[in-house]
Amino acid sequence: MFVDNVDIYVSSGKGGAGAVSFRREKYVIQGGPDGGDGGKGGDLYFEVNANTDTLSKFKGAKHYRAKNGQPGMGRRMSGKSGEEMVIVVPPGTQVFDYESNELLLDLKEEGMRVKFLEGGKGGLGNYHFKNSVNQRPTYAQPGIAGEERHVRLELKLIADVGLVGFPNVGKSTLISTLSNARPEVANYEFTTLIPALGVVDVDEFSSFVMADIPGIIGGASEGKGLGLEFLRHIERTKTLLFVIDLSNYREPLEQFEILQKELSQFSPELSLRPFGIALSKVDALSKEEANEKIELFLKGIGLSSCQSNQYALSEALQNYIAPLESSIPAFVVPISSATHENIKPLKYLLHESVRRRG
């Protein structure tokens, strides 16, 4: 089960109490104080591990506690420190204060380990309280309480390219064609119910990560459909790929305008992200019908086709490739995942877009 939002309580350990103890040795009638200090409470850490990609294990387990420190002992022996608690999360996990919604940690990188809560200090044993007035103190410090917080964990997947489109426009088929991802693919809306990540191999030494999220529909910003709930998973991407269905009953320009509107209402910053456009399911139309729709779409967004063959694009279909200094949109390319038309050029175009943005 994919879970990307949970709230939990986290606590560091309490320090152990100092000991009240006196020397008890043969021939020592009234031994002095020898109570040891309590052990330190365990610290609580967050650690990033790429072997997990969901927060599902936190469902139902509400409280994570480090161990308390052990009490001190006689002969000035300190108590054992409490065992630390390490909470393992996937890359892209953010930790928020549950009440204030303040961002406390942004855990992006594999192997990252952050101390979040400090364990309480152990109390001092009665040995420390001996003085000229009080030779046999019967007081020792209690341990200091650990820290506790109520936090919300939110997962934002880390990908280079984010797919954006209406339901059933071919996003899942595209990511499974380009990458190692295997999302469910079917000819009905909302087949994709959870985000999917796929690694796209460009050549022996180059690759990038692509993220697919459930389709967005008009009114998503008011809570309709599923896509808006998962838009956070493409917030970290370097570039977006709008997937527009040429065979859809909605005209391509209408699809694009609705998607842009919903993105801007979710996040103005995301709506300004560099992007490319893939006009999908071109195999469902004749070349004449497809070119007519492509030309109409390009005109609608203020562009004209350039019939570029720089990336070995199909010569039978119109396209648009932006000059190097331009970034929005970087390209408009008709594709077919069924026949693989322009799929390899699309891979190179996306890789170039990612490479330009570091």
Swiss-Prot record:
Residues at which GTP binds: 165-172, 190-194, 212-215, 280-283, 336-338
Pfam families cross-referenced by the UniProt entry: GTP1_OBG (PF01018), MMR_HSR1 (PF01926)
Keywords: Cytoplasm, GTP-binding, Hydrolase, Magnesium, Metal-binding, Nucleotide-binding
Every Obg domain range: 1-158
Keyword presence, Disulfide bond: no
Residues at which Mg(2+) binds: S172, T192
Biological processes, Gene Ontology terms: ribosome biogenesis
Cofactor: Mg(2+)
InterPro entries assigned: G_OBG, GTP-bd, GTP-bd_Obg/CgtA, GTP1_OBG_dom, GTP1_OBG_dom_sf, OBG_GTPase, P-loop_NTPase
Enzyme Commission number(s) of this protein: 3.6.5.-
Locations listed in the record: Cytoplasm
Residues annotated as domain OBG-type G: 159-355
GO molecular function terms noted in the UniProt entry: GTP binding; GTPase activity; magnesium ion binding
SUPFAM superfamilies xrefs: Obg GTP-binding protein N-terminal domain, P-loop containing nucleoside triphosphate hydrolases
Free-text function comment from the UniProt entry: An essential GTPase which binds GTP, GDP and possibly (p)ppGpp with moderate affinity, with high nucleotide exchange rates and a fairly low GTP hydrolysis rate. Plays a role in control of the cell cycle, stress response, ribosome biogenesis and in those bacteria that undergo differentiation, in morphogenesis control.
NCBIfam families per UniProt: Obg_CgtA (TIGR02729), PRK12297.1 (NF008955), PRK12299.1 (NF008956)
Annotated family: Belongs to the TRAFAC class OBG-HflX-like GTPase superfamily. OBG GTPase family.
Name under which the protein is recorded: GTPase Obg
Protein source organism: Wolinella succinogenes (strain ATCC 29543 / DSM 1740 / CCUG 13145 / JCM 31913 / LMG 7466 / NCTC 11488 / FDC 602W)
Primary gene name: obg
